[in-house]
Structures are given as structure tokens and as C-alpha cells.
Amino acid sequence: MEHKDNSKMYGTTILCIRRNNNVIIAGDGQVSLGHTVMKNSAKKVKRLANDTVITGFAGATADAFTLFERLEGKLEKHPGQLLRACVELAKDWRMDRYLRRLEAMMIVADKSVSLIISGNGDVLEPENGIAAIGSGGNYALAAAKALCESNDKFSQNMTLEYIVTTAMNIAAEICIYTNNNIIMEKIED
């Protein structure tokens, strides 16, 4: 994510992996203001809709909390319909002059679908069950794909938690806006 304003808080890694009817969203704990680490233990993942939806955000913190509130409202209006709630949020994001200025992205998931809601108001479903956003997202995505797509016996026995933790730690080693304080939320079948 390009940092347009060094007075805003940016930078994170959010990773979502879906496997065998289980899904985890993980986020690191670092909050940066410009080039300064302001906090190491921020919680960027949370549960919504009576714990049936998990979500993580990247981008400007205040903007992300605005989107969380809007998404919660859409989920209340369309209970059990995550895709519809996200599409409705995306419509608002595109149409509303205030929302269009928000600098954040989200990954949301329930028991059946994982979605990325982009800063442009797009709703995308990852093809392979792996999604990542934020400054370290590409590193976490590459590591997670490598771990999930490996065909050796060891990789077949790796837990979802192990894959997520390993991928997030690799991202933290590379991305200066990501740390190793990983917080996860999981929905199990």
C-alpha cells in the first residue's frame, strides 16, 4: 500500500487461509505512523455477526473501523448472507463521497466463503482459498501458497495454524511494517 500521508497509521499483514471447511484470518500487531512503530500489539482481526464472521483490515486504522461498523450494519440487515452484505458495503463505498476517501482494505470470511474488499470497493473471492492484504500481504501470500501447494508428506500433515503462523513470520522478516505478534481468529467446521 502506498503511504500517501506519513501522519496516518499504515502497514500491516493480514492473511486468510481456507482449508477443509476451516478458515483462519491472522494479522500482525504492529501499527506504524510514518516510519515509526507506535504499537506492537494492535488487534487487526475480529469477529462479527455473533462470531459467525471473521475479518481483518489493512490500511488507515480509523478508516478500517468505519468500514467495520458499516459491515456490521450490513450483516445485521442481511444475516447469514456474507457475500450480499459485502456487495452492499462495496456499493456504498463506491457511491458515498466520504467512504470513497477511506484508505483501507478488508478480508472477511464465514464458514463458506472468503472475500477481499478492496479500497476501490471491489469484492473479490480468492480462487485457491488463500488471500492476503497489506504491506506484507504479498510475502505472506507467497509463503502460504508454497506451504499449501507442496506435495510432500510433511506439508500434507501441516495444521492450518502452522501454515498461517509460518507465512506470517516470513512476511514479518521481510516487511518493515509487519511484526511477529500474530493474532488469529478461526472458524471451524
UniProtKB/Swiss-Prot annotation:
It is found in: Cytoplasm. Allosterically activated by HslU binding. Keywords: Allosteric enzyme, Cytoplasm, Hydrolase, Metal-binding, Protease, Sodium, Threonine protease. CDD domains: protease_HslV. InterPro entries: ATP-dep_Prtase_HsIV_su, Ntn_hydrolases_N, Proteasome_sua/b, Proteasome_suB-type. It catalyses: ATP-dependent cleavage of peptide bonds with broad specificity. Its EC number is 3.4.25.2. Coiled coil: none annotated. One of its GO terms (biological process) is proteolysis involved in protein catabolic process. It is an enzyme of class 3 (hydrolase). Na(+) binds at A172, C175, T178. One of its GO terms (cellular component) is HslUV protease complex. The active site is at T12. GO terms for molecular function: metal ion binding; threonine-type endopeptidase activity. It comes from the Bacteria. Belongs to the peptidase T1B family. HslV subfamily. A double ring-shaped homohexamer of HslV is capped on each side by a ring-shaped HslU homohexamer. The assembly of the HslU/HslV complex is dependent on binding of ATP. HAMAP family: HslV. Protease subunit of a proteasome-like degradation complex believed to be a general protein degrading machinery. This is ATP-dependent protease subunit HslV. It comes from Ehrlichia ruminantium (strain Gardel). The gene is hslV.
